A protein has these predicted regions:
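Conserved helix-to-beta-strand junction in the class I
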Residues: 37, 127-129, 187
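Structured surface patches comprising rigid loops and adjacent beta-strands/short helices at the edges
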Residues: 1-8
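Terminal peptide-recognition signature
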Residues: 28, 61, 81, 111-113, ...
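C-terminal hydrophobic helical "lid"/dimerization subdomain
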Residues: 173-217
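Residue-level detector of alpha-helix initiation sites
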Residues: 13, 50-52, 120
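Mid-domain Rossmann-like dinucleotide-binding core that forms the NAD(H)/NADP(H) cofactor-binding site
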Residues: 18-95
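Glycine-rich cofactor phosphate-binding loops and adjacent beta1-alpha1 units
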Residues: 69, 83, 88-161
Length: 217
């Protein structure tokens, strides 16, 4: 990696644990805190809380003083998200996430949504955002086409944005690294953010690489 994108191994972390950080941390910082402008005391809704991005978003948002609601596809995944610090977890297969998000915020809505689904989720996300809320789309697992009520967007003064890091410049990614070093690295040393490593594979072994690929699928 370019030197500007490299960061020191956090105090008390192993090399394996540290290797789990950059991909998800850069994504969460740049989208939730830069584009989404999440502030302490606000409420974040994470679509897919048990994913790698979701796990990082839960811990980082909580460490920086936000309230976190997540969605996940099984009760077990919801429980895992709660164990990581999420305030509430919604099983999107058995509950309407938008209705639940409104209920959990006493009808006010959430301030920021980190969305990895898009598709028909966007219409419901617009409905459950608070006034001046921000929707940040970072993946389109549910489809690239979305429709929503533009009148609601105008009335609530919503911001709908999105990004992908892959196409960004080395200079841009290096700035994210510097921001993470300033704002996140002290949390890692203090234990406010803990590594979550599901399994470790030997990359030099063909079987290990195949097993890793199968697990990701």
């Amino acid at each position: 990696a370019p030197v500007g994108q490299c960061l020191p191994v956090p105090q008390g972390w192993s090399d394996v644990e540290a290797a789990s950080l950059p991909e998800t941390l850069f994504t969460v910082w740049s989208n939730v805190f830069d584009r989404g402008r999440l502030q302490a005391g606000e409420t974040l809704l994470v679509q897919g809380g048990s994913s790698g991005i979701g796990v990082t978003a839960i811990q980082l948002a909580k460490a920086l003083g936000a309230r976190v609601i997540v969605t996940a596809g099984t009760d077990e995944k919801c429980a895992a998200c709660l164990a990581l610090g999420a305030d509430h977890a919604i099983n999107y297969k058995t509950q309407d996430f938008a209705a639940q998000a409104l209920r959990l915020t006493d009808g006010r809505g959430v301030d920021v949504i980190l969305d990895m689904v898009a598709g028909d989720y966007v219409e419901r996300e617009v409905q459950c955002l608070a006034e001046d809320g921000r929707l940040v789309i970072i993946a389109v697992q549910g489809g690239v086409q979305s429709t929503f009520n533009a009148a609601v967007l105008m009335r609530k003064r919503l911001t709908v944005t999105g990004s992908t890091l892959r196409a960004r410049s080395v200079a841009f990614k290096s700035e994210i690294a510097r921001a993470c070093l300033r704002h996140v690295w002290p949390l890692l040393a203090d234990g406010a953010f803990k590594p979550v490593v599901h399994r470790v594979f030997d990359a030099t072994d063909a079987d290990g690489a195949a097993q890793a690929h199968a697990l990701m699928e």
